[in-house]
Structure formats: structure tokens, C-alpha cells
Amino acid sequence: MKESLISFIKEKIEEYNYRGAVVGVSGGVDSAVVLSLCVQALGKDRVFALILPERDSSKDSLKDAVDFCERLGVEYRKRSITPILRKIGVYRLFPPRLFLPDSIVKRYVLNRWNTLSKDPFLDDLRNTGPEEFLKGLAYYRIKHRIRMCLLYFEAEKRGYAVVGTTNRTEYLTGLYVKWGDEAVDIEPIMHLYKTQVFELAKEMNVPEKILKKPPSPDLIPGITDEMAFNMSYLELDRILMKLEKNEDLSDEDPKKVERVKKILELSEKYRRDIPITFDRI
């Protein structure tokens, strides 16, 4: 699989006359895998990594992103998007977090998460909820859209492609932002479920610290992917695979199966063809 993906990236970069690749690096497993694949496909001199933290970003993830770029020896730039978001007025939607410990901020956010909606992830997909909840959607989505603009700015200055990091689980469930992290030129891992990305990451010697970190969009403090799904990635991927293959689901939790079906139903309208993806195997 790894060699196929390396060949895919190399072939598509050449086919579409790109000179190299730009990857947004978050400190998570998906961007670590994609950055590694790009380096192996193109060489480190043709890969540029962009790290774009903001006020709510995890300091640990920021350090992991920097450490991983330095480990691979790629050119990278760290740029805070906090000033841009502040200028737009994004942070006025929620109280300032100056001088507050992360633990208090996370408890506050978690309380709002559970208070504003009975099921925040489904309401996110529906684009419904009270005004405060909708403000929350605007609050986190714009962060990805600002990052997309900066990724393309850096890519086009160099004649590079923006290489995305969305996996199949995220794509099928709608765990991405339209015109944000899904707006890219090439998607090399969109055919891989999250659990398969973890397996590939182990094969590619991604640091254990990144592998053990709870997957999170790192847009809202304290909110993880599995918290949004209300199940583990292992359970989610297993159910998704069975649904795609029309396999027997009798040994799965019926409530979780129904939840996944509802997520797929609601997320369908968000899915659209990405220009260049690796064919599913």
C-alpha cells in the first residue's frame, strides 16, 4: 500500500505539472502520514509544510507538528492565524481564554457542547440548532477556511499542489469542512479508513506520541473525534466497512449501527468528488 501511494503522488504531481507539494501539518496522524508519503515520493526539497495554529490549538500538537517536520528535514513555516481570526471578529463569539488553565477551558467548552445540543455532531451535519450553536459552527469552520487560503497562497507561489489529509472515515461521515480542509488538489489517503491510516502510520514509523494521541480536529478545546461520533474509531470503521460491503451487522450494537446510518444519510449532501484521489482497493 505504501509504495502504491508514493507512486500515486509522484505520478499525479508530474501529470498535472506541479513542482512539489504543500501539506498542512497539525501534529496528528493523518498529516504525519501524508507528509511522509510526499517526502518519499518527491524528496524533502520539493515538499513544504505549513503549520497554522491559533488561540485554541493544543500546544502539544503544535510541538508534535514542528518536531515531525524537523525529523523529516522538510522546509516548514509556523504561522499563527490568531491575528486574522481576531481581525475578522471570530473570537468575539466566545469569551477570551487569557490566563485560564486548559483544564478549565476544556470543561467550559464541554459543558456548552452538551448544553446547546442533544447531539452536536448530528446537528452540525443538519446545520440546525439554537443561535449559539450555529455561532459555534461558524467559529470552528472559518479556521479551516483561513488555513485553506494560506495553504494555496504558499502552494501557488511555488507552483506546488496542496495535498490533503482527509481519510475515508472523515469523508463518509462528513467530519470535514466544505471549502476548508476538503479544498485541495490531491487526496492520497481518502480511500483509507482511520484505523487503516493508523496501521500505515506504524509502518512508516510515525512517532508513538502522535499515534497515542486521541484524534481531534484541534479546533475547539477538549472535543475529540470519538466524542463527536459517540463511539470509537474501531467500532465506527468496522460498521462503515460492513455497510459498504453489505455484510451482516447482527453482531454490532444496533444503536450504534443506526447512528452510523443516520450520519451517512446526513453527510451525503456534503460529499462531492475531489479532483484527484487514489482509486479504492
Curated annotation (Swiss-Prot):
The keyword DNA-binding does not apply. Its EC number is 6.3.1.5. It is an enzyme of class 6 (ligase). Mg(2+) binds at residues 30, 170. One of its GO terms (molecular function) is NAD+ synthase activity. One of its GO terms (cellular component) is cytoplasm. Deamido-NAD(+) binds at residues 145, 178, 185. It holds the Pfam family NAD_synthase. CDD domains: NAD_synthase. Keywords: ATP-binding, Ligase, Magnesium, Metal-binding, NAD, Nucleotide-binding. One of its GO terms (biological process) is NAD biosynthetic process. ATP binds at residues 24-31, 165, 194, 216. Homodimer. Belongs to the NAD synthetase family. NCBIfam families: nadE (TIGR00552). Catalyzes the ATP-dependent amidation of deamido-NAD to form NAD. Uses ammonia as a nitrogen source. This is NH(3)-dependent NAD(+) synthetase. The lineage of its organism: Bacteria, Thermotogati, Thermotogota, Thermotogae, Thermotogales.
